[in-house]
C-alpha cells in the first residue's frame, strides 16, 4: 500500500515511518511547514531528510503557512480576545494534517496517511472510529475529535499499540542516528508557542491592560493585569483586597476587561453545553464518558444532542469548564465525536 507519512523531524514520526517500511508499504515522507518559524523548520526538515535517506523514501515539503495562519493561528488569537481558552491542535488536525495534507497525499496516489499520533483506528459496523491509544498516559485521541469518519478510514497510527517508554529504545535500535538529532526544547504542546501563550499574544494584541476583579455579587474586590492572562480556575496573578483564602477565576468578561472570582466550589458545575462539530445526527442520548480538557480523567455523564448543541449533565460536581475548549464524547475507549464548549 502507498502511504504518506507526516514527518515532524522527531523520533516518534521517524519510527512510525520505519515500522510501516518494515511492513512492506511504499512510503512518501511529508513535512508540513505550518507555523512561521523558519529556523525551526530548517532544523526539522534536515532531521526528516535524514530519516527519509535512511529509509530510502522521498521527502516532500509542503508550505501551508498562509492557510495555517488564517484558519488556526488567527483563530487562536481571536478566541483569547473573546475570553475563551482555545485548543488550536483540534483545529489543525482536521484542517491541515488530515485536510490539506491528506488531499495532497491522495493526489500523489497514496491510499492512506500516517502520523506519530498516539491513537488507534477501529472499524465498527463498517464505520471507522478513533480509538484511544494503548498508552493512556500519552493518548492523543482528544485532539482528533473533529475528524469525519471518511477521513478516519484513511488514517494509520503505527504507535497506537505501543507504550511511549518503549518507543525510544526501539527507534534508536532501528535507526541509531536518531540519537544524534538536534531538536528544540518545546515549552508546551502548541507548536507555534515559544515560551508561553502570553508571549505569542503580545505580538498581536494588548494583553497588559489592567482591569477590575469582581466577586459573584458584582462587587469590585481587586485588580488584574489584563483578562487574556487568565484562564478559568487560575488562582494567582491578580490582587484581592484583604483576601484570607484562595480565590479562583470563575468567569471572564472580555468586553469589560473584568475577572469574576470565587471559591473553589464556585468552579463546580453540573452541566455544560458545546456546539456540535462531529457527533453523528443519529447519536443516542445516554451515559457516556466525556473529557472537557486534554489532561483530564474521562468522566461519566449523561449526554444528549439537541439540534446543534451537545448537552451534558453530571451526577457529581465537575470542575474547571472553560469556554473554547473541546468537549469530547467516548463510549468506553471509542471516540464518538464532540464540540466546542460555549
Curated annotation (Swiss-Prot):
<dbReference type="Pfam" id="PF03054">
    <property type="entry name" value="tRNA_Me_trans"/>
</dbReference>
<keyword id="KW-0694">RNA-binding</keyword>
<dbReference type="GO" id="GO:0005737">
    <property type="term" value="C:cytoplasm"/>
</dbReference>
<feature type="active site" description="Nucleophile">
    <location>
        <position position="92"/>
    </location>
</feature>
<dbReference type="GO" id="GO:0103016">
    <property type="term" value="F:tRNA-uridine 2-sulfurtransferase activity"/>
</dbReference>
<comment type="similarity">
    <text>Belongs to the MnmA/TRMU family.</text>
</comment>
<keyword id="KW-0067">ATP-binding</keyword>
<dbReference type="GO" id="GO:0000049">
    <property type="term" value="F:tRNA binding"/>
</dbReference>
<keyword id="KW-1015">Disulfide bond</keyword>
<feature type="site" description="Interaction with tRNA">
    <location>
        <position position="325"/>
    </location>
</feature>
<dbReference type="GO" id="GO:0002143">
    <property type="term" value="P:tRNA wobble position uridine thiolation"/>
</dbReference>
<dbReference type="InterPro" id="IPR046885">
    <property type="entry name" value="MnmA-like_C"/>
</dbReference>
<feature type="disulfide bond" description="Alternate">
    <location>
        <begin position="92"/>
        <end position="191"/>
    </location>
</feature>
<feature type="binding site">
    <location>
        <position position="116"/>
    </location>
    <ligand>
        <name>ATP</name>
    </ligand>
</feature>
<dbReference type="Pfam" id="PF20258">
    <property type="entry name" value="tRNA_Me_trans_C"/>
</dbReference>
<feature type="site" description="Interaction with tRNA">
    <location>
        <position position="117"/>
    </location>
</feature>
<comment type="function">
    <text>Catalyzes the 2-thiolation of uridine at the wobble position (U34) of tRNA, leading to the formation of s(2)U34.</text>
</comment>
<dbReference type="Pfam" id="PF20259">
    <property type="entry name" value="tRNA_Me_trans_M"/>
</dbReference>
<keyword id="KW-0808">Transferase</keyword>
<dbReference type="GO" id="GO:0005524">
    <property type="term" value="F:ATP binding"/>
</dbReference>
<dbReference type="InterPro" id="IPR023382">
    <property type="entry name" value="MnmA-like_central_sf"/>
</dbReference>
<feature type="active site" description="Cysteine persulfide intermediate">
    <location>
        <position position="191"/>
    </location>
</feature>
<keyword id="KW-0547">Nucleotide-binding</keyword>
<dbReference type="InterPro" id="IPR014729">
    <property type="entry name" value="Rossmann-like_a/b/a_fold"/>
</dbReference>
<feature type="region of interest" description="Interaction with tRNA">
    <location>
        <begin position="293"/>
        <end position="294"/>
    </location>
</feature>
<keyword id="KW-0820">tRNA-binding</keyword>
<keyword id="KW-0963">Cytoplasm</keyword>
<dbReference type="InterPro" id="IPR046884">
    <property type="entry name" value="MnmA-like_central"/>
</dbReference>
<feature type="region of interest" description="Interaction with tRNA">
    <location>
        <begin position="138"/>
        <end position="140"/>
    </location>
</feature>
<keyword id="KW-0819">tRNA processing</keyword>
<feature type="binding site">
    <location>
        <begin position="6"/>
        <end position="13"/>
    </location>
    <ligand>
        <name>ATP</name>
    </ligand>
</feature>
<protein>
    <recommendedName>
        <fullName>tRNA-specific 2-thiouridylase MnmA</fullName>
        <ecNumber>2.8.1.13</ecNumber>
    </recommendedName>
</protein>
<dbReference type="InterPro" id="IPR004506">
    <property type="entry name" value="MnmA-like"/>
</dbReference>
<feature type="binding site">
    <location>
        <position position="32"/>
    </location>
    <ligand>
        <name>ATP</name>
    </ligand>
</feature>
Amino acid at each position: 500500500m502507498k502511504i504518506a507519512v507526516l514527518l515532524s523531524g522527531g523520533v516518534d514520526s521517524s519510527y512510525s515511518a520505519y515500522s510501516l517500511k518494515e511492513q512492506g508499504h511504499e512510503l512518501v515522507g511529508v513535512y508540513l511547514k505550518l507555523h512561521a518559524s523558519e529556523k525551526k523548520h530548517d532544523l526539522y526538515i534536515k532531521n526528516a531528510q535524514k530519516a527519509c535517506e535512511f529509509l530510502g523514501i522521498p521527502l516532500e515539503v509542503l508550505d501551508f503557512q498562509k492557510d495555517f495562519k488564517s484558519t488556526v493561528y488567527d483563530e487562536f488569537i481571536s478566541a483569547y480576545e473573546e475570553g475563551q481558552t482555545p485548543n488550536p491542535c483540534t483545529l489543525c488536525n482536521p484542517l491541515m494534517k488530515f485536510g490539506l495534507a491528506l488531499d495532497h497525499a491522495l493526489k500523489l496516489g497514496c491510499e492512506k496517511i500516517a502520523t506519530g499520533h498516539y491513537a488507534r483506528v477501529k472499524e465498527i459496523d463498517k464505520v471507522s472510529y478513533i480509538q484511544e491509544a494503548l498508552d493512556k498516559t500519552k493518548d492523543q485521541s482528544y485532539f482528533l475529535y473533529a475528524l469525519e469518519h471518511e477521513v478516519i478510514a484513511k488514517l494509520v497510527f503505527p504507535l497506537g499499540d505501543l507504550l511511549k517508554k518503549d518507543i525510544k529504545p526501539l527507534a534508536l535500535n532501528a535507526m541509531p542516528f536518531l540519537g544524534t538529532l538536534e531538536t528544540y526544547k518545546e515549552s508546551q504542546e502548541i507548536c507555534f508557542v515559544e515560551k508561553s501563550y502570553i508571549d505569542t499574544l503580545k505580538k498581536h494584541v494588548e494583553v497588559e491592560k489592567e482591569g477590575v476583579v469582581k466577586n459573584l455579587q458584582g462587587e469590585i474586590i481587586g485588580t488584574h493585569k489584563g483578562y487574556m492572562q487568565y484562564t478559568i480556575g487560575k488562582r494567582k496573578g491578580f490582587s484581592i483586597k484583604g483576601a484570607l483564602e484562595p480565590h479562583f477565576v470563575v468567569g471572564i468578561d472580555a468586553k469589560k476587561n473584568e475577572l469574576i472570582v470565587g471559591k473553589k466550589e464556585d468552579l463546580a458545575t453540573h452541566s455544560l453545553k458545546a456546539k456540535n462539530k462531529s457527533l453523528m445526527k443519529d447519536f443516542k442520548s445516554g451515559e457516556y464518558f466525556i473529557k472537557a480538557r486534554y489532561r483530564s480523567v474521562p468522566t461519566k455523564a449523561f449526554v444528549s444532542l439537541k439540534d446543534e448543541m451537545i448537552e451534558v449533565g453530571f451526577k457529581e460536581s465537575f470542575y474547571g469548564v472553560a469556554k473554547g475548549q473541546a468537549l469530547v464524547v467516548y463510549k468506553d475507549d471509542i471516540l464518538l465525536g464532540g464540540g466546542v464548549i460555549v
